[in-house]
Every structure is written in C-alpha cells, then in structure tokens.
C-alpha cells in the first residue's frame, strides 16, 4: 500500500536515475487522465498536465495505446506524440507506462518518468517500470 504518492514517486525516480515524474489516474469514464502527483515539472506546465485526454501527449498516448511510450530525446524529436510545450520540462529521455486493472482490461492511470539527458529506455527498463505500477494499481482499485 502506498501511503505517500510523492515519496513513492521520488523513490522510483531515484531507482531509474530520473529527475521528473508524474502519476496520473484515469477518470471514471476512462477518457482522461487526472494528475495525482508530480516531481520536477515546471509550474507553468501544471495546468496543461492536470487533465490529459487519452491519446494526447506521452501519458495520453500510453493510456490509449495500452503500452509504454518512450522518447529518447524530447528536446529534438517529439516522436509524434509529445506536445510542443513538453520541451519546457527540459527533459530529454522520457517513458510513460499504463497502469492496468487486476484483470488487465482497464487502464487505471499512467506512470511517467523523465531524465535530462537523452536516453533510449530498453525493453528491460520498460518492463521494470511496468512492474513498479503494481502498488499504484492496488491503490487505484481500493
């Protein structure tokens, strides 16, 4: 059980050597993501990430596609999914993974991490971050 989402996210960022992170939860109708907590996102962007439609931006793409979305260098290439304002984070390497319900049918939210340096997240790193979503699933299903 997660008692402090902010502290939990900080530990995930430490484990992955990342400087920014977000946790979003799906709205009851399953069409948007609402921000639960964040670390390292500039204040000017908070209103833009507080409610994200499925399919928009990195987190929205991960929710809609139901799979990890990874960008090596957000500063140079938006990868067809990131919004131009995402560059204001100063993040280069980024990864967002969906949080699935116990039965795997529903996207409960998205966990996102980012680092300042360009980085290609490996399949192993993507799988490791997906595994980290288990406590969030338990929290969101309560």
Model-predicted segments: where are they?
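Amphipathic alpha-helical coiled-coil segments that mediate homodimerization
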Residues: 3-23, 58
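Short hydrophobic/aromatic beta-strand element in the GNAT-like acyltransferase core
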Residues: 20, 96, 110
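Regulatory loop-to-helix N-cap segments in sensory/regulatory domains
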Residues: 114-132, 139-142
